[in-house]
Amino acid sequence: MPAYRSRTTTHGRNMAGARALWRATGMKEGDFGKPIIAIANSFTQFVPGHVHLKDLGQLVAREIEKAGGVAKEFHTIAVDDGIAMGHSGMLYSLPSREIIADSVEYMVNAHCADALVCISNCDKITPGMLMAAMRLNIPAVFISGGPMEAGKVKIRGKSVSLDLVDAIVAAVDPAESDADVMAYERSACPTCGSCSGMFTANSMNCLTEALGLALPGNGSLLATHADRKELFLEAGRLIVALAKRYYEQDDETVLPRSIANFGAFENAMSLDIAMGGSTNTVLHLLAAAQEGGVDFTMADIDRLSRKVPNLCKVAPATPEYHMEDVHRAGGVISILGELDRAGLIHRQMATVHSPTLGAALDQWDIVRSSYEAAQSRYLAAPGGVPTQVAFSQGNRWESLDLDRAQGCIRDIAHAYSKDGGLAVLYGNLAKDGCIVKTAGVDPSILIFSGPARLFESQEAAIAAILGDKIQPGDVVLIRYEGPKGGPGMQEMLYPTSYLKSKGLGEVCALITDGRFSGGTSGLSIGHVSPEAAEGGTIGLVEEGDRIEIDIPHRRIHLAVDEEELAQRQRAMEAKAQQAWRPVNRNRTVSLALQAYAALTTSAAKGAVRDLGQLNRS
């Protein structure tokens, strides 16, 4: 029977000093011996997805205490990728994931907490906390802040739903007036919550449901809706029950590594492929799997992408649907339900809230179940009022979206495509693979070739796009922006958005060893591995080289013969210390980022730390 970890600091005469300090935090005599539950909150006023979280940690804490636990809250950092986008701030986004994971580990282990509630929401916060939970392997429950409501605006007499990406594209579209751009800006992000499309934040919060670590509705129930409060309260009750099952009943099935095992990672990736989630999820799932000792790789993602269909298209893949529409159609559980009916998921996986995923689907899938709580939960609708306050409205849809032929979520027979919404491509340009969000690619350019237009920074590519130097048919190639080369593997939302605004979104490709925002659509291929800074072929491409892309056959090829590539490699390596470095880039890299670059691995491995290098040092 495992002992409560917290007894290290709460029991025995020699721990009088530690108990004195615990008493100074508010603990009473009767609290020593109860499970101490750490609440990792990520409240910040910098991020709209987190501005409403300030009091929610204490909401969970009170519920923990009612259930017989002791709650102790702490906070992590949180970077807003949208605000950090398009300038040097983006260098810090991915590295912040590791800082978050470390900070959660530090706080939980330093204070010997028994269990963990993770209050996350936006892009790197959920992955960082997930990595920490897998690393710590103590009972854990995830509860996110919830999605933002979609914006609503009237442009040229027509009412449209919109999101952040629409505002970015409109800002550089010469056809849009200043007044219309201002209307987009003021309407794109109307409430608190994670941006309203199937971007990285919402994708990751959906995946925590599929992994079995979050409650039904976590990924799709709006931040503003009163029903979301119950998820926070339930998380507080649940974590105490899980802690007691582990420490008092020796039930290891409640631990993150027992729940989020290989089968659960397959379920999560299958969900991601089916819903056309952000390409960043590949990076984060690979990282979390490594933290938990799960042998889940790019090869597994490639295999799943060939058999799981695309059942859901949400912004940015289509302007028609946002997260509030996914929720009305039954959320993550209903997408998993459709995959279940096709035999494409593992039903027997455990979850924090149900004995198995199959049992959860039978209860919460609105197509198969008449469970009143499920029917009610998925009727939660947007309020349509700008606010930064959580749980501030109680609007309900008049009906659920059960149309699996033409609705937001499709069944297998009516899938958008038999191949899923994400694909792994291989070839001489990406020997270890690269990722494309096929759900956002126009069918006319699934097979594409063109001359490489070469850039060694995101900034240079943006200048060329806005300067009308990119032509239809070009392949914009941005290199030295990978985990080591950037460093930090910048997101390329602005280049892809500007291509769209210039009318080039369906006639050009963009390839990079960097990554893309969840808001990216178009023929955008990222995570090229090995990256240029690691000696990848992408570092040998020259201006005008022909690049061939064949998504149906999962192929990406640099049309340069092997002898020429070998000669280029010899010339590169002759540069000694200047080899595999950008030639004409002036970028200040801080000591913190240099340390990140020194330890990080390839995107094909999730850009986690290189344990081999650590072991050698």
Swiss-Prot record:
Cofactor note: Binds 1 [2Fe-2S] cluster per subunit. This cluster acts as a Lewis acid cofactor.
InterPro entries documented for this protein: Dihydro-acid_dehy_C, DihydroxyA_deHydtase, DiOHA_6PGluconate_deHydtase_CS, ILV_EDD_C, ILV_EDD_N, IlvD/EDD_N
Gene Ontology BP annotations: isoleucine biosynthetic process; L-valine biosynthetic process
Needed co-factor(s): [2Fe-2S] cluster; Mg(2+)
Pathway, per record: Amino-acid biosynthesis; L-isoleucine biosynthesis; L-isoleucine from 2-oxobutanoate: step 3/4; Amino-acid biosynthesis; L-valine biosynthesis; L-valine from pyruvate: step 3/4
Disulfide bonds: none
Documented EC number(s): 4.2.1.9
Binding site for [2Fe-2S] cluster: C122, C195
N6-carboxylysine: residues carrying this PTM: K124
Cellular component, GO annotation: cytosol
Residues the entry annotates as binding Mg(2+): D81, D123, K124, E491
Catalytic residue positions: S517
Keywords linked to the UniProt accession: 2Fe-2S, Amino-acid biosynthesis, Branched-chain amino acid biosynthesis, Iron, Iron-sulfur, Lyase, Magnesium, Metal-binding
Reactions that this protein is recorded to catalyse: (2R)-2,3-dihydroxy-3-methylbutanoate = 3-methyl-2-oxobutanoate + H2O; (2R,3R)-2,3-dihydroxy-3-methylpentanoate = (S)-3-methyl-2-oxopentanoate + H2O
GO molecular function: 2 iron, 2 sulfur cluster binding; dihydroxy-acid dehydratase activity; magnesium ion binding
Keyword Metal-binding among record annotations: yes
Function: Functions in the biosynthesis of branched-chain amino acids. Catalyzes the dehydration of (2R,3R)-2,3-dihydroxy-3-methylpentanoate (2,3-dihydroxy-3-methylvalerate) into 2-oxo-3-methylpentanoate (2-oxo-3-methylvalerate) and of (2R)-2,3-dihydroxy-3-methylbutanoate (2,3-dihydroxyisovalerate) into 2-oxo-3-methylbutanoate (2-oxoisovalerate), the penultimate precursor to L-isoleucine and L-valine, respectively.
Cited PANTHER family: D-XYLONATE DEHYDRATASE, D-XYLONATE DEHYDRATASE YAGF-RELATED
Family recorded in the similarity comment: Belongs to the IlvD/Edd family.
Subunit composition and interactions: Homodimer.
Protein name: Dihydroxy-acid dehydratase
Organism: Nitrosococcus oceani (strain ATCC 19707 / BCRC 17464 / JCM 30415 / NCIMB 11848 / C-107)
